Amino acid sequence: MLTFPLINDTSRKIIHIDMDAFFASVEVRDNPSLKVKPVVIARNPLQTGGRGVVSTCSYEARAFGIHSASAKEAYDLCPQAIFISGNYEKYTKVSKQVREIFKRYTDDIEAASIDEAYLDVTENKIGAQSAIKIAKLIQHDIFVELGLTCSAGVSYNKFLAKIASDYEKPHGLTLIMPEEALEFLAKLPVEKFHGVGKATVPKLHALGFFNGGDLQKADPVDLAERFGVYGWELYQKANGIHNSKVKNYRERKSVGKERTYGKLLYLPDDIKAELSKISGKVSDSLKSHQLKGSIVILKLRYSDFTTLTKRKSLAEKLESPEEIAEVAQEIFEELEYDESLGVRLLGVTVTEFGAQKATLDMQ
C-alpha cells in the first residue's frame, strides 16, 4: 500500500526576489525618455521579417496585452511600441550588482534566473528576526543604488515565496505565514501554481481541479496514478509543503529545460524547431549562471511514454543557443526516430561544467 507522509518544515524564512520587468526597466533607467512608454525587448519585427521573440516588456507594454509572444504579435498589439534589441552584457552586470546587495544579508542564495533569486534568511548577517525587514531593506537598496524596483515574496518555503512575489507587482511585498498558507492556496487557480504548464491545466480542469482547494481535497494516490510523481508534488504544494532547500551554485551540476506538448509532434522539422526554442532557454539559464558545458543531453518521450535519452560529448564547452541547438538536432538525427508515434515531451540539458568558475549572476 502506498503511503504519503506529509512532513512540512515551517521553520525557514525564505525570500523570493523578482526584478520588475528587468531588461526593460534597465533600458528605461538608462534612457529616461522611455519612461511611461511601451518598451519591448526584442528586435523590431519590421527589420527582421517578423522573426524574433519578446524577452520582456515594460508594464506600459503589458497593458496592451503583450507578454511572452513573438515580436510580430507584439507589434500587432501595439504598433507604437519601442523595440530594443537588448544588451545581455549590461543586464548581466546589473544582475551582479543585485547579487552584491543580497550578499549583505545572506550567503544562502539561489539564482532562479538572471532576474530572480531565492534567499534563505533564517540565519542572516544582520541578526534580523524578521524576513520582512530584510526584504524591505533589499528593495530599498536596489531602488536607491540601482534605480530599479523588485517584488518580494516571503514565506517558509520556496514555492510559497515565489507565489507571494508574483501576488503584487510591481514593487510589491507579500508575506504568507504558515497559518495562512492553506487558505491562501485554496483560492489560488491551478494555473497560478508554479510548474503547472498550459498542457496540464485543461487536464486538471477536466478532473474537477480548478484551484488549490480542489487539490487539497483530492486523493493523493489518485493524483500520483494520473500524473506520476508530479501529481504527488502538486498535492504537497496545494497543502503548503515544499521542502526543497535554497541551493547555491556549488550544488548545480546541470542546466536543462523540458517541454510537454498537448498536441503531439510528428514532423522532424517541427521537432527540430522546438529543440531550437528549448536550447534558447537553456542558453539563457547558462548565461545567467555564467556556465558552459561540454555535454549535451537530448530527451524525447513518445506518446506511449517510451523515453529516449542520448548524450553527446564535445571537445569545447558551449553556451550559445545556436551551438546547443545544433548539437541537440544532431543527436535527434542520430536517433532511430519513429514518426508514427508522435512526441509528447522534449528536453535539452547541458552538463559537465568542469572546473570553470561558476559564479552566478544573482547568486
Swiss-Prot record:
The active site is at residue 116. It holds the Pfam family IMS_C. Its cofactor is Mg(2+). SUPFAM superfamilies: DNA/RNA polymerases, Lesion bypass DNA polymerase (Y-family), little finger domain. It is an enzyme of class 2 (transferase). It catalyses: DNA(n) + a 2'-deoxyribonucleoside 5'-triphosphate = DNA(n+1) + diphosphate. Residues 14-197 form the UmuC domain. The record marks 23 as: Substrate discrimination. InterPro entries: DNA/RNA_pol_sf, DNA_pol_Y-fam_lit_finger_sf, DNA_pol_Y-fam_little_finger, DNA_polymerase-Y, DNApol_IV, PolY_HhH_motif, Rev_trsase/Diguanyl_cyclase, UmuC. It comes from Lactococcus lactis subsp. lactis (strain IL1403) (Streptococcus lactis). GO terms for cellular component: cytosol. Binds 2 magnesium ions per subunit. Its main location: cytoplasm. Its EC number is 2.7.7.7. Belongs to the DNA polymerase type-Y family. Keywords: Cytoplasm, DNA damage, DNA repair, DNA replication, DNA-binding, DNA-directed DNA polymerase, Magnesium, Metal-binding, Mutator protein, Nucleotidyltransferase, Transferase. Poorly processive, error-prone DNA polymerase involved in untargeted mutagenesis. Copies undamaged DNA at stalled replication forks, which arise in vivo from mismatched or misaligned primer ends. These misaligned primers can be extended by PolIV. Exhibits no 3'-5' exonuclease (proofreading) activity. May be involved in translesional synthesis, in conjunction with the beta clamp from PolIII. One of its GO terms (biological process) is SOS response. PROSITE patterns: UMUC. This is DNA polymerase IV. GO terms for molecular function: damaged DNA binding; DNA-directed DNA polymerase activity; magnesium ion binding.
